[in-house]
Amino acid sequence: MIRSSVDRIMLHVCLALLPTTAWGLYLFGWPAIYLWLLTCASAVACEAACLYLLGRPLRRLLDGSALLSGWLLALTLPPWAPWWIAVGGSMFAIGIGKQLYGGVGQNVFNPAMLARVALLIAFPLQMTTWALPLPLGTEGAPGWLEGLRITFAGGALADGLSGATALGHLQTELTLGHSAAQILDGHFALLPAFLGYSGGSLGETSELLILLGGLWLLALRIIHWEIPLGMLLTVGALAALANQIDPQVHGGGLFHLTSGGLLLGALFIATDPVTSPISRSGRLIFAIGCGALVFVIRSWGNFPEAVAFAVLLMNALVPLIDRVCRPRAYGRNARGKPLVAAKWTRQVKEVDKV
């Protein structure tokens, strides 16, 4: 039974994530399944522990917010990451990113992205080691027992089982003096990237399934169109412009739109109603800022993927954006002060005419 609007939102977002999650679990096999289960279970367990220690009712677990935070974090992790990445990241997301601010609806930053950035800074090797797709049941794919060993015993991936993402490969090869066109010609194909046959984080492989889930949320009016559309258009426009100016260094707009976690971030992460602006104009400003930061960090930053950094930086500006874009109260000026009598009378007459 859905108990509140919060429960309803969390349920529908989880349902929208199911297609891309199921595809990622199939594509990367048993280690990815264990990672996803561990991350979600750890997030819920940490939420329960925090509620108990703070003397809050445990029924708040039923709102699904902890499960969703763990789920989103899992989708942004390398699919064969060790167990302690899953557990530690979930504990950080819930304990620091959520409960430290007062619980659901009070957090300033997106908990999943805060945890991902913390993991990336603390454990850069584990967070940038990517397994190649080995679908369940295919030759060479680890069975359930081998998957347990990979997840819980750890160990470096063999060269034949690991590879760089398209964004990471571009960044590395550019430092060696190769042009972007040469690099992407043999390492990036648009259709496989869109359909979901390329490596990367657990939940970012199939742009098609992410898009379908996001469109469903838009149809239900659970998310607003301004953030995903504004963010994607900004990244695409800046990337296309940069590619026209200097094609030797910059990939094109379609490459940036279908690579990494941009689509997942635009539809499922940046649209978090708690950490995004409340007004339409504010959401557009937020989206453009996120998109611009994604492109800038991808192009000149130390990390090839930039969605988490961009979202967190713009989360910090949300209070300012809300203040600047706050609708003017009736009978008051833009600063919130009462209008003088003449202006007030004119405003009333204009309303009466309507």
UniProtKB/Swiss-Prot annotation:
Its EC number is 7.-.-.-. One of its GO terms (biological process) is electron transport chain. Its cofactor is FMN. It is found in: Cell inner membrane. NCBIfam families: rnfD (TIGR01946). The complex is composed of six subunits: RnfA, RnfB, RnfC, RnfD, RnfE and RnfG. This is Ion-translocating oxidoreductase complex subunit D. It comes from Stutzerimonas stutzeri (Pseudomonas stutzeri). The gene is rnfD.
